[in-house]
Amino acid sequence: MVSLLRCQSSKPYSSLICSLALGVAFALSGTAYAEETKPTETVPAPVVTPPKVTPPPATKNQVRFTKTGAFDSDYVVKLARKLAAKPYSVLKDPLPVGLAKLTYDEYRDIRFNPTASIWRDQGLPFQMQMFHRGFYFQDLIEIAIVEGNKATHLAYEPKYFTAGEVITQALPNDDIGYSGFRIHNQLNNNGVFDELMVFQGASYFRALGKGNAYGLSARGLALKTADPEGEEFPIFRAFWVERPHYDSNLIVVHALLDSPSVAGAYRFSVRPGDNTQIDVEATLFPRVELSKVGLAPSTSMFLHSLNGRHDTDDFRPEVHDSDGLLMFNGRGEHLWRPLANPRQLQVSAFSDNSPQGFGLIQRERSYAAYQDLEAQYERRPSLWIEPVGNWGQGAVVLTEIPTESEIHDNIVSFWKPRQPIPAGSEYHFAYRMSWGEEPAVKHNYVVVSRTASGRADIAKPTPRRLFVVDYQVNGAMPEELPLAKVEASGGIISNVVIAPNAANNGYRLAFELEPEGKELIELRAELKFPTPRQVETWLYRWTL
């Protein structure tokens, strides 16, 4: 999704939406970066006077973190520890005024030259391209290339970029740094290096599995999400990218995180494939107690679907990057919580001990569900998080923010530890990310395939709601119907019906909810089979 914002809403949550989306990396080119070819013109082109090019003023920036020199596996950890021991400092890195005030179209005009890609002529399985500073992306991000035990600072050079069709100023000659980078790999076709992963904006990054198109994003850390006083956005200040081996499907990226509350060291081990796997190892060094912290955060978009369109005037049946939150909890339950676009900010917490996995999932994979030729929402990746080790007590937190446009990221999920992380401590955690399809459904598992809702009274509109939940069986249908159990935190549940659904090799559960004046009701539905089998538990928060 394009994360440009028109941040002009007067609603109290608009600043939160803007903050979330401004950090998301732009997809400034197509997935493959084959050099552009222009069509043959059939009529003479008009003579156009080239715009006058204004030379930029001299800019002086210093290399703080990625200085050329020795590098080992603990280098970034030591750097983060040292950084956290000092008060937070707002780094001021000069950027020519012309770059700082670029429009969106002008910024898009600055493109990385594919022929200058890092490792392009070395026959390696990965290549790298950098992003220019400017527009919203004004922070200086340092990058170093690691080979063996040596890191080499990657200085900015204007020759890496092409511009001039829209922009009217020359690119700087000084080392102004970069705003991020992207990694390319022959993910989909041999001989074509497609985009695999992007780091750009605060601590945001995103990746693709085979056949995917960019959708949701991840972050290094979430702090004070949905806090009335405002969210804090840590930033990856520097990256060290290890030169990949010729015969390896692995590339390793180290990152230094910083914010007023915490510094941190991250290691990303990236393995592309049908589902691209990223193993994340992190060490946090809090400057202050972290009581509102989110580990392994994901950010997505949900506008509307069959379970709540809120009078949406849209030719497309569904519009979303993710349609549900999937959780495998420490008690062995599999929970499915469809997402919503509420009228008011909603925060849900699902308490757990030693979570086995959670993630924002794009379960609906048919074009017919979206009918969008350009956005191709059916190709957006799911992001599954598997904690490494015991994460202890805490909660999977889901934040749903009202939005009226698909350009706004309005969904956030993460793990919140039960106990605050003390100031001055060292907090280690690790997890595996899978970008692509959701976790494989085992044989005989029963999963929720569709959620829909609408008014229950046909004759006239009333508050009473009808819910329809479809389940799909992976394998042969059991001979006996399951029993359906539906619970609600308020209101009255009635007319519970479970029936076979031959259309999807499963079942359809239908029930009605009478809110009785309630504005928020938690719903839970379970199917019980005579012969025990794994069945997803359906959860939903109904709101006015």
UniProtKB/Swiss-Prot annotation:
MF (Gene Ontology): carbohydrate binding; catalytic activity
Recorded superkingdom: Bacteria
GO CC field: outer membrane-bounded periplasmic space
GO process annotations (BP): beta-glucan biosynthetic process
Pfam hit, one: MdoG
Subcellular location(s) of the protein: Periplasm
Matching Gene3D superfamilies: 2.70.98.10, Immunoglobulins
Coiled coil: none
Major subcellular site: periplasm
Family the entry assigns: Belongs to the OpgD/OpgG family.
Protein name per its UniProtKB record: Glucans biosynthesis protein G
Gene name as annotated: opgG
